Each structure stands twice: as structure tokens, then as C-alpha cells.
């Protein structure tokens, strides 16, 4: 079967399941913001009540929270909800309605520039500046968010303010086509078809990039199957430069930002690195941004009309043929090339045989479609193939080939002329009016009360939409949804034109202008309560006086029920949310029920929490309201207050005794919600009132896990500071993941630092797959996490369930395509950048080298009997790894031999030079290297220690020391800072403004041949370049990155001397010679280890030459017997750099196996945590009165004691409530 036949068969099944309608569902979620993003499923209920005599009445309940995050096992969770206050939009629908929604979104997300009828000055930023289509207000009006952050509405019918630059983000694709230049298949966005060549197509990028012959004319095809538009040849057409969010642009968060503080906070900037696809179905709809804080991620720029970013300094895009771009709205949304649009009345006038033939491939034909041959239907949808979905009075919806349909010529196909003051009747068919309202004010559930009622036209808009007053409310209607009162009601609820008598018209007008048209006293009562009219509520309840706005007396009918419900809510709920205390007091005097639930299970206390009404909550609590009541989503008022960020309400609820740790339907406690919403003050408050940190939600996350997953450092710090259960740090989820695993998985460096340093987390804990946090960090190539764990002593050689160590994982990620790019291992600059940048293709190789240089065993085999080297097909990388391993072994043999059993500080001193007994041990490493205590130390040793100091500084996020003010200011103007280096002397004496006027260097008086502005470091891009290389004369690297360089990263010239920035500014000092040892290290491309690694090296030196077992990194490593030449050393590569060749070896430690002191520390920490955990369990289970017996009796308040004490007390010892009933536990 051919591809076309397959598609046709699939399409023919459409009508087989189309009849009968059905419930509609939600749309598919957008992809999570990058694979390592850290949002987790959190939901909340937000209750909204808006009651106004001018704007109508409605109550809405919605959800809030959410996002998606990377979860263990490669799964991704996502949710989205919106807090709804006021009138909630109506839902419902079916498959056809889904098609309507999808088509109505056509064009949303398109990237646009100004069009031929533009008259809005520089709202867009200027000619060629780009924006994103956010949504269509109507068929004539579209909302655009420009890259500069401006959002406004523009014309897209009659006058065209916009041109479509790129429609690929909308998902428009031309199936079966291929760009004949770049081979993109299928073509997304606009298709450009050569009119002079046979079957030659281009995508937009290639068309505007001048591919193919410029003299050839092209057809522009905007939509699949759409009309072709012939264009003039490109050779003489005008081009404009697109500007906006393109690579190189500087950006901040935009209007749709929902990624918390990934950017570092409001106002923090980042740089666009690349334009990418948010999803495979939406190309060029996202931007990859590197923020100034080092964070990197993907953000929406066009996907579903979203704008996560706003440009601060725009960048240049490509040049485009402006006049060849289509106008936005030429084929307006909701209208196809066949001429049909949503709302049209259509019928089938052809013979049955012809219809059946034409339906092949367009939905097919079934026996139930015979009703279509005699009845008219309404167009309710247009699918992606431009087939028409038609609804009939029976409720069935059928898909048709446009060729079988004919428009019905009737008064309803064109809206009648209306004038202000006309009396109209609203259509009574709910489904029809929902469809008609799309693009005409939309539909709201509260409008259902107006169906079939009489109203008066208050305003006629420019697009013929009507503002109609019905009773005390006003709504915007499609003119097709109403008919003039000069009619009577047909049996089916539609309007049939009949002229009424003058008497009937008079009666209608009288009924229309009665203030209480519906005669529903409960409705008026709830409205009065919502608006705070306490006196009027009193009158309604007393039934004695007449409200001033009603001609009908409350006493003339039945008395108003104080618990009466209107629009799903009671008067107490409406007054509670709006904070009308006087109304609430009136209602309480009339014995209102404070525990009545609305349709979502929310009580008055929930509404008060949503409205931030702490005083109302106090009144309700005194009236006996249950503060722990839960709605249908199992949320308490505390959940709602935390989600809405109402601190005063949270304080009031906790003070009044609200339970701080009840779980909702998702298992989330208020602690989880406070962490998700980053409400740190609320988090502290909850913990102060005893919130339980150990409770897990439905995903298995306790509060600590949740903070680690979300990447919330401030929340993690609060949790670790305030918890009295330190053992919770080691608590595992069902899959064995601890909080440290989650931090490593999601690249949350600050979280990992807090857990390791503040929480004393065990870095070697394993999950169900026996993976440690280091395994996960290596697997995801999170370089900073790897460095943190290695530097803090994580075991590098723990195998997972497959026997793989972290080194196995690193090399497994190193694919053959990546290996080909690493043939030149001498290219230190490139390899170093690979270690700095986790997204670089060489990151896995850099991590492997780093692990090998810090103790990873090259000889360990996994379950498949493979060593790490067996997984590395690149011989050059293998040689590098072996070289690291062998040099480490060689350096270990030069260390003193009796320091393994000493303390960590003693071993560090031994590694730094055990012969020096003075206080210089506590000096910085760079000073220590230069001191006179190393008379035989070579320049390579000094350089190596300087590198160690630099690496330590970087790992602690410290910037290099800055020059003094006198060395920093410009010698000419004294206002700006020095930022220009003179060639060839290499001095820095002036700012960029003054430098052109200087002919001779102000420091050495040498003639200036050239000047060069000092830019950011080419390696890390985090700091300014601050080191001058000789002989090439380049200043392109910072002090941190230059420490290990052998060749200039810009010109690849061998470096002989390095001049520091202070020396270039005229400070004291001498140029630093590049040593042989540093050059050798540069070829490996690794950061030098710090003194933590030197401790491990000193510990390993206790083994004698026969190869006895050595304890290091919390693991005992035994060399392979009889293989003296094998790679059995696992110590630091340059641990012995500070020790001279003349240092005498100390006595060996013999054959005793010595464990490092940090192992004992871990054991002591574990014992302490277990003691605290046991004590916590005792406090939870022991009687709070005698502290001798187990609790086995509980009271109705929820607290308990032992039976002996419970029988003797009358009041609860915890809450002091009277004991009404005692329940024994068995």
C-alpha cells in the first residue's frame, strides 16, 4: 500500500467515531524547560468570586502551580494550571471542538516584522525588529509581543500592520516536501517553490540566504495546500536586516517567564547562544541562553505564542526579502482557502453517489450521515487538511470534503444590522453559542444564565459585535448569536421572524427593565453580600423592609435562606473572600452555616484564605469553623494561603492551631508548596510551628527532596538549619535517591554544596541501581558537581549494578564522532574549555581525564569484564589517561611514607613539604611554594602550586585579587579603568577612550605600534582577560585559565613568559616563566588538584614497594598481585610537586592497613544521626505525660497518651481541650 493510500485509510475512519459528541480533554503539554530543569508537580486551588452589577456575576475556581522537572529514571513531570479569580472560562467540547481550538491557534507563535500599513512609530523597535504573535483577539485584530518587551494589538484585516517572517514556530509543515539545498524534510513554515525549475523547493532560511538562482521567480506557499503567490525575482528585491532575539543578543526574563530564578533573579542578564527547536513539531521556537550566573537553559521564543525572554541589546539576524513575506491575516484565522469559515450555515446538495465518491479520503461515509442530505448544519471546525467539520441539530458532527458543501443563503449567514437600543433575544442553544462566541468576546459559564433571555443593545463595535445588557449584566455577543425581538421563539429555540403586536412589545420592555428580572431573591442576596451591603443583607434576612434597588419586596415572597446558593456559592463565601466583616457578622447573627461547601468543596475559610483576609479567618474560627477542612483536592486553607503568598493569613492560621502538615490529593504539604513558590519566610514559619519535614508526596519526595529537585538553595539552607532531624539528609526515596542524588541529577551545585558541607551528606550512598551521586553527575556531564564531589572525597571507584564506575560512565558517553575531534591532545585550550562547559562535546572526555588524575582506577572491570580503557576506542585519549595514571604513580613514590595514618591536616602538611616545621604550613600555597623552605624546588613545583591555588579559588567561587585603585585607574583621565593593552611592550595604562591619543607608552616610554581592548577570557568567558603572553603579545585569558597553558589559545604560539595584570599596569614583580611540568599538564588539559587531593596522595604513600593495600577516598584499594608494572596508583597527579628530589623518605608504615580519618568521621556522623533518629521516634511514640510508656490511647482532638495517664486526666496535655472520648489503640 502506498503512503498516500495509508493516510487516506486512516482519514476515512474519522466519521466512524465522530457521531454523538463527547467530552473533550486538555491539550498536550509543552516540553519541560530543558532536560535538567527542576520544576515538579505542584497543584493548588485558587478560589475567585467576582460579583458586580455592572460586569455580571461569576465565581471561578482554578488551580495554580507547576512546571516540569527531571526526575530519576529519565522521566519528566509537568503540569500547568492557572489561578482563576473572577469568571472562569467554560470548557467542554469534543474532538471537533479540539480541531476548532487547534485551527483558531493557527498563526499563534509566528515571528513577524512590521508590514506595509504600519503607523505605530517605533513600538517594535524599528524596521526589521522581530516580534511574536501571541493571540488573535478577533479576525481583524492580533496581539504581538515584540522582542523588546512591548505588547500591543495590531490590524490583520483590511489594513495589514504585520508581515510573517517565519511561521515555523507555529508548527506549519508541508508534508512530502524537502528543501533542495539544506535537505530539510519536511519544510516547516513558508514553502518557496521555483516557478522555472521542475520540483525545486526552498525553505525560508535558504530562500532568504540567496540559495538557487536569484533571477528565477518563485511561488510562495504559506500553508499546506494553500494558494500559490507568484513573486518577482530576488535579484532586484529589497532586503532588510532582521534584529531581535538572535545569537549574541543580551536578554532578561520576559512576560511569560515561569522558570523561577534560573536567570539569577529579576533583571539579571544572559546571552543568547543559539536559536533551537522547543519541540520537533515547532522548529526555531526557542533560544538557548547562558546567564551571567553560569546557568544555561532553553527558553520559549514563539512556541505557542510564549515569550520567556525580552531583549536588552538586540543582535543581528539574517537579511530577508521584506516585500516577499506574506501579510499576517491575508488568509485570516478561522478561514480556509475554500472560502468556508466557522459559523457558516451549509448543506449538501449533490447526489448520494457523488457525495460518497468525494468523501473518500476526507472522512469517509457512514449510514448515519443521511441526515446531512436534508438538513442544514453549521461549520464548527476546519482541520489541518482543510476538511470541514459540520454540526447538526441531532448533536452529530461530520467531516466533509469542502467540494460537497454549499453555503446556505439565509439571514443568519450575515449578521443583521443592529442599532443601540434594539431589543434582542439571546440564542438558547448552549453548544451553538459557544462556537459562535469564539473570537467574539469568547464564552464564560456565567453567560449561561442569559440564554434565551431578552436584552437591549448598549453598543455596536466596529466589527459588528454587540454589547448587550441582560438584566443587571452586560456581555459581548456575536451578532449571529442574537436576534431582534421582532420575532417569536421557534420550538427548537431558534429565532423565527414574526412581527409582534404593540402590546407584546410593551410587555417585553416592562419585563426587561425590571431590576429583578429573574425574580430570584437569593441571587440578589448573594450579590449584596459580595458587594459588602450589610444593611441590605439584614433587610433580606429580616424580610421586613424593601431593598432600595428592587421594586419587589423580600417579604412578598418566601424569606431568603441565609445559606442560599447562587452560581455555586453562598453569601458567606462571597463575603469572606472580599473581606466584608460587617456582612459576615450579620450572617453569623442569623445562624449561617460556616461549613457549607461550594462545588469544589471550598468552604468560607478557603475563600477567606484566597482573598488574603486574615481578620475574616479569626472571626470564622471563633464561630467554630474547621480550619483544617479540606476541599475536593484535599487542600486546607493553609495550602491556599501558602500558594497565594499571603503571609498574614499563614501566620493567623498557624497561630489559631491549623495543622501545618496535612497533605492534599497530590500528597503535598504546605511545606512542599512553600518550597515550590519560593516563599522562604513562610517556610521558616511552618517549621517553627512544627511542620513535618519527613512526609512524602505522591511522587515520593519529602520536603528536602523537593527543595533539591526544585533547585531552591535558600529553602535548602532553611531546612538544614531549622530541622531537628539531621538524619533526614540521608533519607532515600523508593528508588533509592537521596537529596544529593537529585541535586547531582539536576546540576544544582549550590544545593549539593549545602548538603555536603552543611548537611554532612554521605556522598557514597547508592540508589536502587547502586549509583552514587557521582555516577549521576558524570552521566549527565555536570562538571561542577563532579568537581565538588571529587574534591570533597567521594569514592571514585564504587561500581553500580552493572559493575560500572563513574569512569566507565564518562567514557561510554564519549562517542566515536566526538573522539575524532580530540586527535590533537596537545590542544590544551580546547580541552580545558571542554571541562569548563558541560555542553561541549568534549565534556565527557575531560571528565574522564579529571577522574583518572584524581584516583579513578583504570583496571576495574564491570560485569561484562570491561575496563574503562576497553570502552575508549580513541588511542590518543587512552594514552592521556594512562599518562595521568602513571605520573600519579610516579609522584606518589616521592611522598613521605609515614603520613598515611595521621590526621587530615598532618597529611596535608606532609604533602606540602613535611620538612618545614614552621608556621608557613598555614600560608597560602602560592606563598608556600615561593618560600625559602624549598631550596631545591624547581620552577615547575612552584608553578604547579600556583595552579592549585587558582583551582581552589575557582572552586570556592572567588575572583582573583584585584589591583589597587592606583594601578586600576586610567593614567590620562583618572575616571575610567584601564582596559587597553599597548603592543609590543604589553603595558596597560589607559582606558579605551584615551588610548588613541597616546603615542608612547606612559610606563616604559616605548613607541606604541598597536592597541588592543581587553575583552573577556576566551576560555571561561566569566572573567576579564588579565594575563599577557610573550612572545605572541596576546592578552586573551584570565589568571585562572592561564595557569596551565603552554600555548596561546588564540594563535597557538608557544608561551615563554606570562605577565600578570598588575605587572602590565606597572606594578612590582617579575614575569613568570612557563615550566616544563606545567606544559606537560597542559597537554593533558586538566585543572590542577588542590590540597584535598594532596591529602589522599600522602595517605597512599604509606604502602611499601611490595604493593600493600592502601585506604583512600573512603575505599580500600588493593593492587593486582604480581603486576608491578600495572597501573595500580590512584593518587593525585601532582601531589608530590612541592617535595624536592632531595627530601629524605620517612619510614614506611609497614604492612598495616590504615584507614583515613574521614572514614572514622563518617562513622561517627552516622552513629550520631542514628541516635537522633531513635530519639525522634521515641518522642513520637512515648506518652507525653509520664515519658515511660508507649502511647496507646488517643482523644478526639488527635493527641494521645498511655492508658494509665489518659484515665486520670480531664484535659488534653497538648492542646488543653476537654477530653470527650478516649479511644484505645491495639
UniProtKB/Swiss-Prot annotation:
Alphabetized, the UniProt keywords read: ANK repeat, Coiled coil, Cytoplasm, Metal-binding, Notch signaling pathway, Repeat, Transferase, Ubl conjugation pathway, Zinc, Zinc-finger
- Renumbered to this chain, the Low complexity biased-composition regions fall at 31-42, 73-86, 900-914
Q: Where is this region: Disordered?
A: 1-42, 66-87, 890-919
Q: Where are the ANK repeats?
A: 567-596, 600-629, 633-662, 666-695, 699-731, 735-765, 769-798, 802-833
Zinc finger (RING-type) in chain: 970-1005, 1017-1052, 1183-1216
Where is Zn(2+) 1 annotated to bind? 179, 182, 203, 206
What is the protein name for this chain?
Answer: E3 ubiquitin-protein ligase mind-bomb
What is the organism field in this record? Drosophila melanogaster (Fruit fly)
Give the taxonomic lineage as stored in the record.
Answer: Eukaryota, Metazoa, Ecdysozoa, Arthropoda, Hexapoda
Q: Which gene encodes it?
A: mib1
Amino acid at each position: 500500500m502506498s503512503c498516500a493510500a495509508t493516510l487516506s485509510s486512516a482519514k476515512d475512519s474519522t466519521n466512524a467515531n465522530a457521531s454523538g459528541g463527547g467530552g473533550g480533554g486538555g491539550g498536550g503539554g509543552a516540553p519541560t524547560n530543558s532536560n535538567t530543569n527542576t520544576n515538579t508537580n505542584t497543584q493548588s486551588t485558587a478560589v475567585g468570586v467576582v460579583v458586580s452589577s455592572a460586569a455580571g456575576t461569576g465565581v471561578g475556581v482554578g488551580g495554580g502551580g507547576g512546571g516540569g522537572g527531571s526526575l530519576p529514571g529519565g522521566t519528566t513531570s509537568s503540569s500547568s494550571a492557572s489561578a482563576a479569580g473572577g469568571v472562569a472560562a467554560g470548557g467542554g467540547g469534543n474532538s471537533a471542538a479540539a480541531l476548532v481550538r487547534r485551527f483558531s491557534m493557527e498563526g499563534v507563535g509566528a515571528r513577524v516584522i512590521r508590514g506595509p500599513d504600519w503607523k505605530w512609530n517605533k513600538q517594535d523597535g524599528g524596521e526589521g525588529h522581530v516580534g511574536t504573535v501571541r493571540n488573535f483577539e478577533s479576525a481583524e485584530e492580533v496581539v504581538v509581543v515584540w522582542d523588546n518587551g512591548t505588547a500591543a494589538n495590531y490590524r490583520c484585516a483590511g489594513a495589514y500592520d504585520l508581515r510573517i517572517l517565519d511561521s515555523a514556530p507555529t508548527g506549519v509543515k508541508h508534508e512530502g516536501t524537502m528543501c533542495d539545498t539544506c535537505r530539510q524534510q519536511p519544510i516547516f513554515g513558508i514553502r518557496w517553490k521555483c516557478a522555472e525549475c521542475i520540483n525545486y523547493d526552498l525553505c525560508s532560511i535558504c530562500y532568504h540566504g540567496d540559495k538557487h538562482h536569484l533571477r528565477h521567480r518563485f511561488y510562495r506557499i504559506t500553508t499546506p495546500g494553500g494558494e500559490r503567490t507568484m513573486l518577482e525575482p530576488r535579484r532586484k528585491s529589497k532586503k532588510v536586516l532582521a534584529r531581535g532575539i538572535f545569537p549574541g543578543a543580551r536578554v532578561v526574563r520576559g512576560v511569560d517567564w515561569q522558570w523561577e530564578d534560573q536567570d539569577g533573579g529579576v533583571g539579571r542578564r544572559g546571552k543568547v547562544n543559539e536559536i533551537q527547536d522547543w519541540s520537533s513539531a515547532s522548529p526555531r521556537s526557542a533560544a538557548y541562553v547562558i546567564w551571567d550566573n553560569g546557568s544555561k537553559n532553553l527558553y520559549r521564543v514563539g512556541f505557542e505564542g510564549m515569550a520567556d525572554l525580552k531583549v536588552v541589546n538586540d543582535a543581528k539576524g539574517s537579511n530577508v526579502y521584506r516585500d516577499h513575506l506574506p501579510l499576517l491575516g491575508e488568509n485570516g484565522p478561522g478561514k480556509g482557502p475554500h472560502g468556508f469559515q466557522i459559523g457558516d450555515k451549509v448543506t449538501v446538495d449533490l447526489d448520494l453517489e457523488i457525495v460518497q465518491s468525494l468523501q473518500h479520503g476526507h472522512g469517509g461515509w457512514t449510514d448515519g450521515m443521511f441526515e446531512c442530505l436534508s438538513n442544514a448544519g453549521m461549520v464548527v471546525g476546519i482541520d489541518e487538511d482543510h476538511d470541514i467539520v459540520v454540526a447538526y441539530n441531532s448533536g452529530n458532527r461530520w467531516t466533509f470534503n469542502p467540494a460537497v458543501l454549499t453555503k446556505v443563503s439565509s439571514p443568519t449567514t450575515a449578521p443583521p444590522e443592529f442599532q443601540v437600543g434594539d431589543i434582542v433575544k439571546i440564542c438558547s442553544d448552549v453548544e451553538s453559542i459557544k462556537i459562535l462566541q469564539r473570537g467574539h468576546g469568547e464564552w464564560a459559564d456565567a453567560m449561561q444564565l442569559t440564554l434565551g433571555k431578552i436584552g437591549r443593545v448598549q453598543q455596536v463595535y466596529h466589527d459588528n459585535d454587540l454589547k448587550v445588557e441582560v438584566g443587571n449584566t452586560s456581555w459581548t455577543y456575536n451578532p449571529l448569536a442574537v436576534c431582534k425581538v421582532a420575532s417569536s421563539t421557534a420550538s427548537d429555540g431558534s429565532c423565527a421572524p414574526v412581527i409582534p403586536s404593540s402590546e407584546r412589545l410593551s410587555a417585553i420592555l416592562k419585563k426587561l427593565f425590571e431590576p429583578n428580572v429573574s425574580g430570584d431573591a437569593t441571587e440578589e442576596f448573594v450579590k449584596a453580600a459580595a458587594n459588602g451591603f450589610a444593611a441590605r443583607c439584614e433587610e433580606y434576612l429580616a424580610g421586613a423592609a424593601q431593598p432600595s434597588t428592587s421594586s419587589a419586596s423580600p417579604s412578598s415572597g418566601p424569606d431568603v435562606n441565609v445559606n442560599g446558593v447562587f452560581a455555586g456559592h453562598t453569601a458567606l463565601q462571597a463575603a469572606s473572600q472580599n473581606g466584608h466583616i460587617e456582612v459576615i457578622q450579620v450572617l453569623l447573627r442569623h445562624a449561617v452555616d460556616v461549613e457549607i461547601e461550594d462545588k469544589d468543596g471550598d468552604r468560607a475559610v478557603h475563600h477567606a484564605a484566597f482573598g488574603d483576609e486574615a481578620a475574616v479567618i479569626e472571626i470564622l474560627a471563633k464561630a467554630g469553623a474547621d480550619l483544617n477542612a479540606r476541599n475536593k483536592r484535599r487542600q486546607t486553607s493553609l495550602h491556599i494561603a501558602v500558594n497565594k503568598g499571603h503571609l498574614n493569613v499563614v501566620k493567623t492560621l498557624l497561630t489559631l492551631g491549623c495543622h501545618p502538615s496535612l497533605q492534599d490529593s497530590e500528597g503535598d504539604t504546605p511545606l512542599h508548596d512553600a518550597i515550590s513558590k519560593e516563599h522562604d519566610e513562610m517556610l521558616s514559619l511552618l517549621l517553627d510551628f512544627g511542620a513535618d519535614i519527613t512526609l512524602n508526596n505522591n511522587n515520593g519526595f519529602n520536603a528536602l527532596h523537593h527543595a533539591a529537585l526544585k533547585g531552591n538553595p535558600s529553602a535548602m539552607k532553611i531546612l538544614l538549619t531549622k530541622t531537628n532531624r539531621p538524619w533526614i539528609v540521608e533519607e532515600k526515596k523508593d528508588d533509592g535517591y537521596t537529596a544529593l542524588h537529585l541535586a547531582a541529577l539536576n546540576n544544582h551545585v549550590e544545593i549539593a554544596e549545602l548538603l555536603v558541607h552543611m548537611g554532612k551528606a554521605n556522598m557514597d550512598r547508592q540508589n536502587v541501581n547502586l549509583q552514587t551521586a557521582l555516577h549521576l553527575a558524570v552521566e549527565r556531564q555536570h562538571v561542577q558537581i563532579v568537581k565538588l564531589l571529587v574534591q570533597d572525597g567521594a569514592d571514585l571507584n564504587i561500581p553500580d549494578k552493572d559493575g560500572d564506575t563513574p569512569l566507565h560512565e564518562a567514557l561510554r558517553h564519549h562517542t566515536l564522532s566526538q573522539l575524532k575531534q580530540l586527535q590533537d591532545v596537545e590542544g590544551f585550550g580546547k580541552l580545558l574549555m571542554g571541562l569548563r562547559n558541560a555542553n561541549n562535546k568534549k565534556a565527557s572526555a575531560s571528565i574522564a581525564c579529571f577522574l583518572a588524575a584524581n584516583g579513578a582506577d583504570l583496571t576495574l572491570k564491570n560485569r561484562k569484564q570491561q575496563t574503562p580503557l576497553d570502552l575508549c576506542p580513541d588511542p590518543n585519549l587512552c594514552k592521556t589517561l594512562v599518562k595521568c595514571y602513571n605520573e600519579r604513580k610516579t609522584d606518589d613514590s616521592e611522598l613521605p611514607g609515614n603520613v598515611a595514618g595521621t590526621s587530615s591536616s598532618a597529611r596535608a602538611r606532609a604533602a606540602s613539604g613535611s620538612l618545614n616545621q614552621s608556621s608557613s604550613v598555614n600560608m597560602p600555597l602560592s606563598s608556600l611554594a615561593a618560600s625559602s623552605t624549598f631550596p631545591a624546588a624547581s620552577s615547575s613545583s612552584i608553578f604547579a602550586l600556583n595552579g592549585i591555588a587558582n583551582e581552589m579559588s575557582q572552586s570556592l567561587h572567588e575572583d582573583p585579587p584585584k589591583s589597587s585603585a592606583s594601578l586600576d585607574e586610567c593614567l590620562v583621565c583618572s575616571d575610567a579603568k584601564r582596559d587597553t593593552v599597548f603592543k609590543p611592550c604589553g603595558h596597560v595604562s589607559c582606558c579605551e577612550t584615551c588610548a588613541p591619543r597616546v603615542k608612547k607608552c606612559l610606563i616604559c616610554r616605548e613607541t606604541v605600534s598597536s592597541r588592543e581592548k581587553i575583552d573577556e577570557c576566551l576560555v571561561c568567558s566569566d572573567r576579564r582577560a588579565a594575563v599577557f603572553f610573550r612572545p605572541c603579545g596576546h592578552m586573551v585569558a584570565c589568571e585562572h585559565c592561564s595557569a596551565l597553558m603552554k600555548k596561546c589559545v588564540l594563535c597557538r604560539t608557544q608561551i615563554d613568559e606570562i605577565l600578570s595584570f598588575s605587572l602590565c599596569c606597572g606594578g612590582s614583580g617579575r614575569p613568570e616563566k612557563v615550566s616544563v611540568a606545567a606544559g606537560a599538564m597542559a597537554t593533558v588539559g586538566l585543572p590542577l588538584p588542590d590540597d584535598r587531593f594532596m591529602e589522599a596522595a600522602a595517605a597512599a604513600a604509606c604502602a611499601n614497594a611490595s604493593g600493600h593495600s592502601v585506604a583512600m577516598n573512603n575505599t580500600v584499594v588493593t593492587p593486582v598481585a604480581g603486576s608491578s608494572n600495572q597501573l595500580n596508583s590512584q593518587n593525585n597527579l601532582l601531589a608530590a610537586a612541592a617535595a624536592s628530589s632531595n627530601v629524605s623518605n620517612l619510614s614506611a608504615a609497614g604492612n598495616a592497613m590504615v584507614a583515613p580519618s574521614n572514614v572514622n568521621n563518617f562513622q561517627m556522623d552516622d552513629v550520631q544521626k542514628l541516635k537522633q533518629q531513635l530519639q525522634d521516634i521515641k518522642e513520637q511514640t512515648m506518652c507525653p505525660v509520664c515519658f515511660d510508656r508507649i502511647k496507646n490511647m488517643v482523644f478526639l482532638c488527635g493527641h494521645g497518651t498511655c492508658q494509665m495517664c489518659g484515665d486520670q486526666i480531664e484535659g488534653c496535655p497538648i492542646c488543653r481541650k476537654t477530653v470527650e472520648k478516649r479511644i484505645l489503640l491495639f
